[in-house]
């Protein structure tokens, strides 16, 4: 495309401006139709141009006016400088002309200096003579705390006079001693005044309730002193900076000039001091002598130190007496908490907000509370540790006191903190009571274990009652009444940590109760009457229900986090286990009566008389007369199943380990025994269950009486349900048969071994069961 050259625009010499204008034109007239609006655009641009020209004209006029005024000011200044030069020259000339007109000028000059010095000395003497009067006035003002500001102003004035006098006469020992004697009352007054200030600060809470205005005045005095300290630091910093830059006074000034300068400074200081005396309540920190140092500690730091000492002094008696009278200590602690409300409502209002006194008091009091309770807790713990057993003995501190402390912290203190507007404070005060909670837990542990032992002993000595047709004792009621009592006591404190601790010991005690019960049932069941053993079954089943109730109750008391610390599952399983062991104990009682009869099985006597019937009769007698009416139905079924399993296991042990040979009557007698077992146990168990249990006797009957070829078949039937059987069992049985040879036995045992290897694929994890419990690996079993 051909490039079209642009015609330069009139009035636009700058190329960038021309380019911008051309782009604007291209933008507004990009097509032919837009040319119709050329006139409108032209009018608009002309109007904009006029507006811009008017603005520029105004700005130029304004700048010209400013420049004109500046030139006028510069011209006037130049004229004044010229006149000053002329006047100075005239003055020098006049001074030179008149210096010789006055006779004895130098002498007159010295006399005048002496006169000025004498006047100043007389003024100083007059001021010094008023010191006793001012000291007496301050002494009188000290009797009323409301005069603190006035006392502070007057006392600081005396201190400044004292300091200046010491400076002026420091080269004359006699005069210096006289000055010290004259001002002897000033240091004492200062000391008394400061002690008064800090005594008021120490007793801020008490004074705030009587004369809060006094605290306001003390705060003003402290602020004055802090401001003075700040100014002194700034001056020292400036002086250090000047010294570092090498700036110093001219050492060549003559003596007369130095005296005059000193006198001038004295006059200026005297004027300032008079001004201060006339306006005591408007204290000007700037009238302090630059070189004056009162050698006092930082007022801000001293203020905090006094408060901390005051608070420590209040707590010291409680630290000393808490272990002797905890109740009184807790009353004192309540008073201290009440003081925090006074601080919030009155004391903090008397001091500047920057002091943040309320939070300071809260932090200090909370720290002291934590230390107080912590030291008391540690003292109680250390004084009750038995080094032989490492247990805490709780005779010297009543558990009621521990509960009282915990309840106060959780209820009262937390409520008061909330009223004070404090939502969270660290460390939690309850943490300081951890040693006491530990002591209380040990108390619960000992108490619960004593109760458990007593309950078990009494339970075995007394005959159980029949409740709803079942044997029951008071053991569950007594046990869980004690548990509920301890839970209620702990819950009353509203302390979840204590509830968790108590329930941990309760869980431990319940498991201890279970262990003791199991030990008794397993090792001494022969000493316990049958009805008591039956009561154990029923009781522990009820204990399971009671435990569930306790779990529900605890879950309503604790939040989910604290509830997570407790595990009741072992307790629930433990009570079921006790009932199981009690059921086994009933079985042991019954089988003690059957022991002699069972040992006759598969002997000569077994062939001569019916031994199964006496066993069935014994079962019938126990179950019908002594057990069925007094035991829970589900445990009756478990007992029946246990009796059947135990009997079958003992019969198999007799069968496998028998030393008598089988004969032609073996099959018939075994069949009769199996039928009698089925007939009896089907009354208490499902027929399918009894049949499955008795099937193993049927299979052994077939292995004893069938042909040698069928033995592996019946062995397979047995191993399907009893994986722990092996070829050794079959070997012991087959060697009691008289109708087969050893070679046949050897051959069939090979087949049996193959079956066993097929089933037992993991030699490191052998199966367990009836046969694994039998001692069948001793060769003495062979006849």
From Swiss-Prot:
Residue ranges of the region described as Disordered: 228-294
Protease found in the keyword field: no
Protein localization: Cytoplasm; Cytoplasm, Perinuclear region; Cell projection, Growth cone; Cell projection, Neuron projection
Pfam families reported in the protein's UniProt record: Sec6 (PF06046)
Low complexity bias spans: 260-285
Gene3D superfamilies: 1.10.357.50, Exocyst complex component Sec6, C-terminal domain (1.10.357.70)
Coiled coil: 147-184, 259-281
Identification of the protein by name: Exocyst complex component 3
A single cellular component GO annotation: perinuclear region of cytoplasm
Summary of the function given for this chain in its UniProt record: Component of the exocyst complex involved in the docking of exocytic vesicles with fusion sites on the plasma membrane.
Residue ranges, compositional bias (Acidic residues): 248-258
